[in-house]
């Protein structure tokens, strides 16, 4: 798999992670299903980001943060269909949450997962 393919795949896992973190922040609750999705997205994201032979990671911390920023709006749009069974638009949902807090939470979870699976 090429580096670009890996980055695209990592971005997909970031979007899934953010989608569920946005729902948690907006609804102020979680479900076992959301927790499993978060866990699986983190596990697959970290596995895909890890370089096998050379060691290290494809994306640096700065790249991870930039990637989370980049996919946030798509995750917010998709979360608007799921949070409260789609009662709110993405714009309304964005007013219920703090974008920086959600992105920082996602980054912290990625960091923690990288450290515990190293």
Feature-to-residue mapping (PLM):
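Surface/interface-facing alpha-helical segments and adjacent flexible terminal/loop regions used
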Residues: 1-15, 19-118
């Amino acid at each position: 798999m090429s580096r670009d393919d890996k980055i695209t795949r990592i971005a997909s896992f970031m979007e899934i992670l953010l989608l569920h973190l946005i729902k948690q922040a907006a609804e102020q609750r979680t479900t076992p299903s959301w927790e499993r999705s978060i866990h699986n997205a983190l596990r697959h994201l970290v596995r895909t980001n890890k370089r096998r032979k050379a060691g290290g990671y494809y994306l640096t911390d700065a790249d991870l943060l930039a990637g989370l920023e980049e996919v946030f709006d798509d995750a917010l749009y998709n979360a608007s269909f799921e949070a409260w069974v789609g009662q709110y638009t993405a714009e309304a949902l964005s007013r219920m949450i703090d974008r920086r807090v959600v992105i920082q939470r996602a980054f912290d979870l990625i960091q923690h997962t990288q450290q515990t699976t190293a």
